[in-house]
């Protein structure tokens, strides 16, 4: 098939899709979504059989998905909608999450489901979950969706209901050392890593925290530095401590 990859940035998932599709013999082109009018122009010039959007930050123009079958990758299970799916999953402590291939539609992540995969959630940074579990699930779901399209199926399974979760407000990422448990602090950091970071006050100075892991023995005053080792510092929490790389 003649496939157009439409993406905000040619990120790891977009690159994986490009390589996998090319190796399977598909003719693949990449268009960066920088402006709706440029997207429409690119589609009209390329005349794709299928458009796949692995990573976007805004809606696909209606003029595109009304004329061309357009599949969107959403890093959440069917029924989940919104721009910060993995962030919310980590913050809420979900035990299982997923990724699905949807048809583009008027409302965010509300299109028909062509395929989906689920995976257990690790205690890990958002970027790690995205590049491993979410990416592997997305590739598997993509092949299932393509098989259905090649069989002549015209649409996926309609979503009966869904919950839209808005962008995670910066206040929900801010660490309160005296209220948040170590687990809650880690969730905020993991959900905000690699961006935008979890805002925290450490000994009177504000920092955006990344790359943290729990300490099993040391304890100290919440928000205070209690130890240093190599390129990391240990910060006390209300019920323990954690290490933060510097």
Task: Report residues per predicted region.
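Donor/substrate-binding cores of folate-linked one-carbon enzymes
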Residues: 2-4, 17, 56-164, 171
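An anion-binding loop in the catalytic cleft
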Residues: 5-7, 19, 178-246
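Structural motif
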Residues: 6-10, 32-34, 54-55
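Short N-terminal binding/cap micro-motifs at the start of the first secondary-structure element
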Residues: 11-16
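A short beta-strand-loop structural module common to alpha/beta enzyme folds
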Residues: 27-38
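Short amphipathic alpha-helix with an adjacent loop that forms part of the alpha/beta core around
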Residues: 39-46
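Short, structured active-site "lid" loops
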Residues: 46-59
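Acyl-group handling in specialized metabolite and lipid biosynthesis
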Residues: 168-179
């Amino acid at each position: 098939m003649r496939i157009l990859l439409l993406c905000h940035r040619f990120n790891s998932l977009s690159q994986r899709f490009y390589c996998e599709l090319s190796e399977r013999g598909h003719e693949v082109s990449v268009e960066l979504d920088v402006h709706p009018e440029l997207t429409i122009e690119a589609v009209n010039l390329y005349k794709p059989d299928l458009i796949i959007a692995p990573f976007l930050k805004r809606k696909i123009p209606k003029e595109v998905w009304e004329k061309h079958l357009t599949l969107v990758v959403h890093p959440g299970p069917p029924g989940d909608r919104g721009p910060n799916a993995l962030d919310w999953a980590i913050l809420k402590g979900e035990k299982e999450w997923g990724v699905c291939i949807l048809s583009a539609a008027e409302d965010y992540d509300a299109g028909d489901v062509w395929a989906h995969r689920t995976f257990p959630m690790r205690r890990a940074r958002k970027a790690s979950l995205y590049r491993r579990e979410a990416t592997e699930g997305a590739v598997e779901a993509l092949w299932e969706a393509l098989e259905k399209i090649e069989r002549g199926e015209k649409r996926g399974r309609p979503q009966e209901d869904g919950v839209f979760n808005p962008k995670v407000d910066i206040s929900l990422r801010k660490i309160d050392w005296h209220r948040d448990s170590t687990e809650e602090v880690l969730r905020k950091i993991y959900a905000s890593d690699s961006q935008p970071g979890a805002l925290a006050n450490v000994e009177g100075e504000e920092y955006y925290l990344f790359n943290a892991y729990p300490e099993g023995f040391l304890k100290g005053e919440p928000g205070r530095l209690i130890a240093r080792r190599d390129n990391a510092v240990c910060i006390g929490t209300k019920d323990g401590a954690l290490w933060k790389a510097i």
